[in-house]
């Protein structure tokens, strides 16, 4: 039987790049990798209301640069920047190096796969019907510019005795086209009947040429200039 590969891993260095961007040798590699995992876990668990999509970590020289992509940056920054300074101090203690924080606003959370998956998971926890949650997410994504979207939910859907997988798709989602800009994410909904897994694929158009940093750069430019990035 065929198996679906991870769309992000398949497109690394084509139109996607890594979320951890640094180089290390020997035991330093394991130490930095563990630090990255701790940083991401701490940020996501302590800022659940910020709607965080991803955390990008770069380590030039002795500096640790952390970029947080979130739909609600105000929750991270806090009143007069007090909360972000506390976060920076905590991360500096965890890593033992100088930390620079950069907050990037996600202007269209409806077409961000991680936020869509987490939104569906939150609705399932609140006992919203899974078909209604999936259809609502699909319609919102298409309305805001996605060319195609597919959502799958797997588990004891609706409290059924036997677990199954249900999916809903609209538009094009060309997983075999490497130049396709496919945004993919997973989430879990911990319900009274057990864990339900959610997977989301969003097709945002094709990226011609070899530019792994294209999407990240457009989002950073939009943050500083106030102009929304093109699909």
Swiss-Prot record:
Q: GO molecular function terms here?
A: mRNA binding; rRNA binding; structural constituent of ribosome
Superkingdom in the source lineage: Bacteria
User: Could you describe the subunit structure of this protein?
Assistant: Part of the 30S ribosomal subunit. Forms a tight complex with proteins S10 and S14.
The record ties this protein, via SUPFAM superfamilies, to:
Prokaryotic type KH domain (KH-domain type II), Ribosomal protein S3 C-terminal domain
Per its record, how is this protein called by name?
Answer: Small ribosomal subunit protein uS3
Q: Which PANTHER family match?
A: 30S/40S RIBOSOMAL PROTEIN S3, SMALL RIBOSOMAL SUBUNIT PROTEIN US3C
Q: Which residues form the KH type-2 domain?
A: 39-107
Question: Per its database record, what is this protein's job?
Answer: Binds the lower part of the 30S subunit head. Binds mRNA in the 70S ribosome, positioning it for translation.
Q: Member of which family?
A: Belongs to the universal ribosomal protein uS3 family.
Listed A to Z, the keywords are: Ribonucleoprotein, Ribosomal protein, RNA-binding, rRNA-binding
Q: Which organism is it from?
A: Novosphingobium aromaticivorans (strain ATCC 700278 / DSM 12444 / CCUG 56034 / CIP 105152 / NBRC 16084 / F199)
Query: Record's Gene Ontology CC terms?
Result: cytosolic small ribosomal subunit
Q: Which GO terms describe its biological process?
A: translation
């Amino acid at each position: 039987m065929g198996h679906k590969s991870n769309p992000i891993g398949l497109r690394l260095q084509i139109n996607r790049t890594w979320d951890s961007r640094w180089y290390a040798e020997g035991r330093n590699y394991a130490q930095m990798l563990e630090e990255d995992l701790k940083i991401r876990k701490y940020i996501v668990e302590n800022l659940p209301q910020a709607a965080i999509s991803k955390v990008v970590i770069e380590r030039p020289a002795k500096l640790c640069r952390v970029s947080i992509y979130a739909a609600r940056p105000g929750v991270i920054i806090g009143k007069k920047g007090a909360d972000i300074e506390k976060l920076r101090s905590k991360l500096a203690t965890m890593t033992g190096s100088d930390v620079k924080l950069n907050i990037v606003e996600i202007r269209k959370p409806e077409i961000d796969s991680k936020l869509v998956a987490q939104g569906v998971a939150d609705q399932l926890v609140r006992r919203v019907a899974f078909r209604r949650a999936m259809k609502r997410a699909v319609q919102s994504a298409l309305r805001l510019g996605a060319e195609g979207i597919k959502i799958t939910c797997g588990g004891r859907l609706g409290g059924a005795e036997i677990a199954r997988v249900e999916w809903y798709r609209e538009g094009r989602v060309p997983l075999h086209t490497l130049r396709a800009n496919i945004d993919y994410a997973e989430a879990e909904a911990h319900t009274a009947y057990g864990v339900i897994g959610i997977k989301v694929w969003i097709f945002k158009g094709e990226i011609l040429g070899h530019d792994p940093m294209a999407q990240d750069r457009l989002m950073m430019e939009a943050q500083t200039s106030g102009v929304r990035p093109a699909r």
